[in-house]
Amino acid sequence: MAKFVTIGERLSTTAPAVNKAFSERDPEPILKRAKQQLDAGATYLDVNIGPAENDGPELMKWAVELLQGNFDNVPLALDTSNVAAIEAGISVYNRAKGKPIVNSADASGRLEYVDLAAANDAIVIALCNGEGIAKDNDERMMYMQTLMERGMEHGMDVAEDMWFDPLFLVIK
């Protein structure tokens, strides 16, 4: 891995203002938050549109084009449980400054996200969990191995294109 990467995580529908802006296709709040994160040193911006069951593909395309069009093709992490929306975002993504990130795969219900990243020459964030958070490091390693093997089956460069998140819990 060549460098430390900072991913800005403030473009998420979990924030009421962002949810409203995405729903209404209001660019100003989104652009303002994006600029704040980039000014603070973010390398990538995470675009979390939530499940977006009704209009996910259109919304993700709109968000990708908005952000890359206003911020010189800023690299993005596409974050949603809607696979069609991630595919749509990748279809309009400009790779001039970096590959898209598929956020995120796990060793259970989202293993297909590794396949999606591999098929689109994208990076994948791979959460070292399955049905829940791993109870110990051995379980984390088991999940990581499952994800890594899946990526290798598709010819992914595991060192460059699979970013593992061990999901460590806070120690009290």
Where would I find each of the regions flagged by the language model?
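Catalytic beta/alpha-barrel core
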Residues: 46-53, 74-82, 99-109, 128
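Active-site-adjacent beta->alpha loops and helix N-cap segments on the catalytic face
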Residues: 53-63, 80-88, 93, 106-118, ...
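Structural preference for beta-strand elements that scaffold enzyme active sites
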Residues: 2-6, 43-46, 73-77, 99-101, ...
